[in-house]
Amino acid sequence: MHYTTAAEAVKLIRSNDSVYIQGSTSIPEALVAAMAERGGELEHVTVYSAFAVGAFDAPYCRPEYKESFLVNSLFVANNIRRWLADGYGQTIPAFLGEIPALFRDGTLPLDVALINVSPPDAEGYCSFGVSADLAVSAVECAKTIIAQVNRAMPYSYGDAVIHVSRLAAAVEVDSPLVEVPTAVPSETERKIGSYIAELIPDGATLQIGVGGIPNAVLAALGGHRHLGLHTEAMTDGVLPLLESGVIDNSQKAVMPGMTVASLALGSRRLYDYMDYRKDLVMKDVAWTNDPFRIRQNPKVMAINSAVEVDLTGQVCADSVGMRIISGVGGQHDFMYGGALSEGGKTFIAIPSTTPKGESKIRALLSPGAGVVTTRHMVQHVVTEYGVAHLRGRNLAERARALIAVAHPSVREELERAAAGRFGYSFLRLKA
């Protein structure tokens, strides 16, 4: 395969093109930096940026490039949050699993895809490694594919491969992948994790996210048997369960025996575990996040988080008031699929307060807050004070259950709000 420089490769990008940039822990940094260097000669290039982690700043968002690059974020992450807050870009609200369809049906047309892949195997196939998610559909739809071929990228199977013949240009690098440190659960998070673990049966299929609470849940599952993993994001937290055989995927209906994910957010240990592993597949996020595929697995345990929850069970997970801080991701997809799964359960797991001491359970969502998961599919809300069981309960009963797991300092205030809203039907319920 012929390699070129990043500066030469991005000359394939022209004014008025639309460009997809691969995200998660797999940003093709050399290509993105080289594209930004061309800012002075490019005009009206539409950039679709995906979820991203790490310290890499998004240079194309800078004010001096406001006429060069028109930024549409598919998931607001740290690298572009401040630029979007200042008006140098916008976000497209969409379920993560829906975005591939937006590429495929031309709603979001793509001229160029900038991707980060492994070196080719003996048959000429490179792997997306840690990030299949949106990259699979992006390279399917883009007219021009420019690849950063990274020696540090693990080779994963599933949908995550592309033949070198499809690459318009390739740049060879040996650049460490972004690593996401394992979050050590706090005492509060360990309590929440233990409550959830008690409700997970043997033979369950897990969908679990990133952070202290998910890690606390996983750490509490060592005594379980025959768990499965069908998730959007895979982290280091699953490794002990995979290596000990607690997760053996034997009871899954969809790809039994296989660990299924769409992206990986972890350490080098996780990436090395993935390398050429035949019992692990990285899939198009439209496939992993399809609620009607998710529901086919037995006992799906969908475990997600929130910015805030109101007294009826509505969940805001992507904004603080009007300020967008992340994206919908796959929360709705897995909460829906989990609710439909035979024996499935859905959880919203949150500490009762923010680091500033503000309650995360509120009478009403903050003005401007978006509802990511509706009250109709939230079955359990878990804090360090216990589990609010919401499934099948009326609104007044939900309010009483949620107040019981709110921080004690706000319960009286929430009781007054609930009494004013629901009247006698709330007051008759015992605290």
What is the predicted function of each stretch?
Residues 1-431:
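Conserved alpha/beta enzyme-core scaffold
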